[in-house]
Amino acid sequence: MTFRSPIFELSHTYIDDEAALSPMGCTYLGNGLNQDKLDDFSIAGAAVSADLTRKTLKKLLALKPIDEIDRIAQTVMQERLESSLALHDSQESFVLWNVLTSPPSNVRSIFELMPKSTDKDFDNIAKRLAAVDGAYKSWTGAIMEVAKGGKTTAQRQVRGVIEQLTNYANGGFSAMCKNFDAAGKYPAIHENAKLAEKAAAETAEFLKSQYLPIANPEDAVGADRYAVWARYFTGAKLDLRATYEWGMADLKAINARMWEIAGQIKPGAKTLREVADHLDKDPKYVIKGKENVVKFLQDFTDAAIARMDGEYFEIDDRIKICEARLAPEGSASAPYYNPPSEDLSRPGTTWIPMLGKDEASSWHLVSTWYHEAVPGHHLQCATVAIEKERLSRFQINGAWISGYGEGWALYAERFMNELGAFDEPGIEMGYLSAQALRAARI
């Protein structure tokens, strides 16, 4: 293979080398390697990955860019590798897990991205299910070791992950396998689903009895720890006080607008929760049945792509497919997006968690699906996936920065607001509630 520069070549090699240490990373890439295994979440496993990162960073800094494209590729890779090492060296990477992302939920969701066409595919699924116990144990061993140094996850998040694991244990993996193989052609996956459920039950009990009592009773982590994560999530060194004050001011402005809209939706309402409950019950927005929710979101996504293409963006034909699917029970508690595989054989996918319900309300889904699909994450990530001439392989697959990544999707919502997509009061309230959540996070 010919590369435009040594920096692009190193980027390409690093993605391969890192994927070799992460079977789940291979699945995300779609390269077909190690599909019968799961990641090693142990401290020793993380050390191997950190060693690779350190060696790669040293090689990267010794290279000279040949042009502006190269300079940007090098700068992005350097910042991400340095931020990743900061998390590893401080052991922060072992304590940021929650109801949105954690090794248990990532293990569960990776099965949804695996190929399911051949006998070999199902053999991989069976073997990977059998590996769940080992993956979970490698993780619990790591977090207990880190806890000895005083670093633990917030109790509220621990309880949430226990609940997710309990969902997996109570038939979650079996239901998944029935969905994959309704005819029962591959008995091994159904048998091994029981093993995975046993592992989930044992892990939930371990967290409840061993980890929860020593977990952090507070959500706050303090300025020093916050700064490490702020750098990782934004790629920048922030003035934390100024950022906090900006977030508070933004939340105040959003809140004021929400109350203006609340008066149009439910005059006399005493709380915004009361307004949200009213919208949840409004027949105009209620979608009954999981299949109908998915159909609504798929139709919505297809319509958004058709509307945006040619008028506001030139969307490549290769990325005009973006699927809407049901998220596994017990997975992330909010909608999310998975980019396409490197070769585009697996399309970009949006996921809707139903949280045990059989209906949803569209008033808050409209802005969310502009955020997740088009012109949000799908347009963003799928476009990046095909820009192989201008972006290094690391920029495409390894350089996700929330400040830019989520910033794009948040702007996508604001862009649609500018186009009048949220003129209806209920839909605007959904948009504003999502904006308020992001401002409150800051």
Region spans (language model):
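N-terminal maturation segment of proteins
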Residues: 1-442
